Amino acid sequence: MTNNTQRPSGRQADQLRDVRITRHYTKHAEGSVLVEFGDTKVICTASIAESVPSFLRDRGQGWLTAEYGMLPRATHTRSDREAARGKQTGRTQEIQRLIGRALRSVFDLEKLGARTLHIDCDVIQADGGTRTASITGAFVAAHDAVARLLATGRIESSPITDYVAAISVGVYDGLPVLDLDYDEDSQCDTDMNVVMTGAGGFVEIQGTAEGVPFSRDEMNALLDLASDGINTLIAKQKAALEQKGE
């Protein structure tokens, strides 16, 4: 794609930020990842509990749930911890539900057995795209947790049916662009988050016009950008999971 506008980052319109996925980042969790989308950094852990929520008791299947949070100084100015305020914001609840839905879309929960996979995504530095980075990193953490279940004989086959990743796209200065950082996200005309599977299925599309409505052609261009970006992210997930000796 030709870059007809100057992005604040200097990237091409279809260029991702530098993406890094570091596995086994913490000691105790069955799966843990540091995922970096440029200056956005998120620690994702996957923990196994040998129980399920009450609504699934005696149903013969497992559950996957997610929590999301940000360190007080993950952004330009300090924010109080939500625990100190006594409640989660609507944004936090929306994002953690999105992460859970995204991962459940590629899990056969019956194969997980009567156990719960808890996903925790903690943003240590935010520069746009924290929810998409969280989904992309959390999948790798979940994959490692499942590998632990397989290695210890607690499940017979993997419940994971496909890969899943997410990316942001938007219309900035009239041009569809991929993987918005904070400067772009705060100034764009359209902001969209897209979650897709490795097979190309859409799990979720969240799109909003920031004052200027977007056209069907612009939406199609954004989805094409997102699809290509997610293919690249899934290739990075696979490369991370193929690394030995970690």
Swiss-Prot record:
EC number annotated for this UniProt entry: 2.7.7.56
GO terms, molecular function: 3'-5'-RNA exonuclease activity; tRNA binding; tRNA nucleotidyltransferase activity
Catalytic function, reaction form: tRNA(n+1) + phosphate = tRNA(n) + a ribonucleoside 5'-diphosphate
Top-rank EC class of the record's enzyme: transferase
Alphabetic keyword roster: Nucleotidyltransferase, RNA-binding, rRNA processing, Transferase, tRNA processing, tRNA-binding
Gene Ontology biological process terms, A to Z: rRNA catabolic process; rRNA processing; tRNA processing
Binding site for phosphate: R91, G129, T130, R131
UniProt entry tagged with the keyword Nucleotidyltransferase: yes
Function comment: Phosphorolytic 3'-5' exoribonuclease that plays an important role in tRNA 3'-end maturation. Removes nucleotide residues following the 3'-CCA terminus of tRNAs; can also add nucleotides to the ends of RNA molecules by using nucleoside diphosphates as substrates, but this may not be physiologically important. Probably plays a role in initiation of 16S rRNA degradation (leading to ribosome degradation) during starvation.
HAMAP family from the UniProt entry: RNase_PH
NCBIfam families, alphabetized: RNasePH
Subunit architecture: Homohexameric ring arranged as a trimer of dimers.
Family designation: Belongs to the RNase PH family.
Protein name: Ribonuclease PH
Gene: rph
